[in-house]
From Swiss-Prot:
Tagged with keyword Transmembrane helix: no
Protein name: Putative dioxygenase RBE_0329
EC number, UniProt record: 1.13.11.-
Annotated InterPro entries: Intradiol_dOase_C, Intradiol_dOase_core, Intradiol_RC_Dioxygenase
Molecular function, one GO term: oxidoreductase activity, acting on single donors with incorporation of molecular oxygen, incorporation of two atoms of oxygen
Family statement: Belongs to the intradiol ring-cleavage dioxygenase family.
Superkingdom assignment: Bacteria
Keywords (A to Z) from UniProt: Dioxygenase, Oxidoreductase
SUPFAM superfamilies (alphabetical): Aromatic compound dioxygenase
Amino acid sequence: MKKFIFCFLCFWTLNIFAASKGYPNKLNRCKITRNIFNDYEPKVFEPTNNLLRKTGQISRFYGEKVIIKGIVLDQNCVPVADAKVYLWQAGSGGKYPYEPLKTRVDKRRFTGKKDSSFTGSGTATTNNKGEYYFVSMLPYKSVGNLKSVNIRVEHADLKTLETRLDLSNKNICSNECGEINPALIEPQQHLRSYCFDLVLQGATLKRY
């Protein structure tokens, strides 16, 4: 009987390892996103995830409307809920339309003109699937001739991440994105979305 049980366990173990070759472990692909810092964040972030206007304001901007979205994960590839995500960027003219947090910066990178409703900054909170999204516009080419935005993710149990997201063709993805309001994309089927999965150092698995 003992010999039978031993043989059964050996056979079961071999089948598990055989199956694992056919189903690659995605956890091994979860690489921590590297930090890239930016000195031009706003003194005060707008509380909405729509950078095209302040809450209750009519949108009036000069540029191409886009969606920036993704998932926040911990280093074990577990989706992170209730993470604060901050995004800031220059407008189509290459300047930031707000007052900067830091004082020792190139003031020529900022503008006080109010001919556009574009705010240049926004805030989002991840849902229980770790998803976030922003409504924004394509910025002026500024870093290495690339169109990019800056993002920071904060969570009580994880190390804060700050990085740059390049809005290149390789990051374009489907408009089918979780809890995004369909009204934002239905009138414009050509509206482009850019996807970025952000991996923070640390683990939140104990919460699940």
